[in-house]
Swiss-Prot record:
Protein name: Cycloviolacin-O16
Disulfide feature: 4-18, 8-20, 13-25
Function (record text): Probably participates in a plant defense mechanism.
PTM per Swiss-Prot/TrEMBL: This is a cyclic peptide.
TM regions (residue ranges): none
Organism per entry: Viola odorata (Sweet violet)
Length: 29
């Protein structure tokens, strides 16, 4: 999959397989 690490100040991650661990997207196990 794609690496996570985008910021998610809106609470949303646009990278598939990532979830928001404010303020950075983290990979969903």
């Amino acid at each position: 999959g794609l690496p996570c690490g985008e910021t998610c100040f809106t609470g949303k991650c646009y990278t598939p397989g990532c979830s928001c661990s404010y303020p950075i997207c983290k990979k969903i196990n």
